[in-house]
């Protein structure tokens, strides 16, 4: 009986999170595309992850999806935007997930890393300001376990990365160039192996190269 009620609770929570996702999309709040979040969850499940550091919480959707689907997972997440942070706290608390999700209201670039509560992590998930991907990576990769993974979302930026010359908006063009620079940098980095997946808006799974 308890397994059945657990299953019911799980389904209710998943449907509830889908409603949250739809509401966020209507309000133009950036949430990870469905196929992207399911891919992320499968990566965490495959490695039996127990800890994930997320850069960019938005309204808490991806963190809640992760802890709902990955048994025993703790997510620690950092959000800069005040409104989104407040909404994330509300969403997490309403669903009684505050024992599985730790959220910090701060700029991840200036965040005091001594405040991290669950380091080292099985996974670092970067889905925040795209122009800062390399800085986020360099700051937080030391807190990823030797066999851990780094997942970076949004690397195609709506396909624009393949057609930079035709972008009219100057700011958008600068942003896409920065994403491309990060992509080139990480793909050519001698310390990391990178697998690229055309899922959602382009996802990279990055692992440290095994030492010879």
Regions flagged by a language model, labelled:
Residues 1-151, 155-212:
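A short alpha-helical cap/connector motif
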């Amino acid at each position: 009986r308890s397994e059945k009620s657990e299953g019911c609770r799980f389904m209710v929570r998943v449907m509830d999170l889908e409603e949250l996702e739809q509401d966020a999309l209507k309000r133009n709040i950036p949430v990870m595309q469905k196929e992207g979040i399911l891919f992320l969850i499968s990566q965490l499940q495959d490695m039996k992850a127990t800890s994930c550091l997320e850069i960019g919480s938005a309204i808490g959707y991806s963190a809640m999806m992760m802890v709902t689907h990955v048994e025993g997972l703790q997510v620690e997440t950092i959000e800069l935007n005040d409104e989104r942070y407040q909404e994330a706290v509300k969403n997490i608390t309403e669903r009684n997930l505050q024992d599985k999700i730790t959220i910090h209201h701060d700029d991840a670039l200036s965040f005091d890393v001594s405040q991290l509560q669950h380091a080292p992590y099985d996974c670092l998930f970067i889905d925040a300001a795209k122009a800062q991907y390399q800085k986020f990576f360099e700051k937080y990769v030391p807190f990823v376990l030797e066999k851990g993974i780094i997942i970076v979302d949004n690397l195609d930026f709506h396909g624009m990365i393949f057609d930079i010359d035709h972008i009219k908006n100057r700011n958008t063009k600068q942003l896409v160039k920065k994403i491309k620079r990060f992509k080139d940098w990480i793909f050519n980095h001698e310390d990391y192996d990178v697998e690229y997946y055309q899922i959602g808006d382009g996802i990279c799974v990055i692992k440290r190269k095994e030492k010879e």
